[in-house]
Amino acid sequence: CDVCAISSSEIEVVLKGTLCTLPSSTQIISLNGKSFEEICSEILKLGEQLDAEKEAKQHVDKAIARRNKLDSLPKYSRKILSLEWIDPFFSAGHWVPEQIEIAGFRSAIGQKGEHSRVISIEEIIESDPDDIAVICCGYKLHENKLFAEKLKNNKEINFLRPFKTDNIYSFDSDAYFSRP
């Protein structure tokens, strides 16, 4: 999203503007997939543009096969609240709710393909999550652990079940959730 990543329009302005020495005929390929399917489609398009269609198809086929294996795993009723930011609170969006579903869980806030957005304390409380995933965009595991600790001190939400059951998890966002 444009909160933590440079927008494609900003990139185009810089690359085709006076700040850059690239010729104005340079083709800019913007990738903005918001779901597993869209990301796979964009990989194939990129393969076409780079004359690497065979390699792109191999990567997509491998990803689809891996995903299909996950579909056979048990499904759980647990709701996971994934937070891409904690001040203000941002819900996870784009492909993250789909990742949660593929793993066999339910997204407490956010649906496949929706943009990340600011969420209120009330929405967090109403979502009644079983678990909270701290996946602050652009941060590694050790930094997200610090954010999770800070979250535990937030009196507006630290009475929720995940805090009582110690079901607050931190992840390396760049490795698993940020732009692929």
Show where each model-derived region lies:
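Acidic/His-rich segments in extracytoplasmic proteins that coordinate ligands and/or metal ions
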Residues: 1-49, 117-159
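A structural micro-motif
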Residues: 16-18, 25-26, 78, 105, ...
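Extracytoplasmic metal-acquisition and chelation regions
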Residues: 22-50, 88-101, 165-180
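Basic- and aromatic-lined ligand-binding clefts that recognize polyanionic substrates
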Residues: 53-105, 176
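Short, conserved clusters of charged catalytic residues that mark active-site
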Residues: 58, 65-67, 116-119, 152
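Short hydrophobic segments within beta-strands
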Residues: 81-83, 135, 171
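Short, solvent-exposed loop/beta-turn-alpha elements that line the ligand-binding surface or hinge
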Residues: 108-115
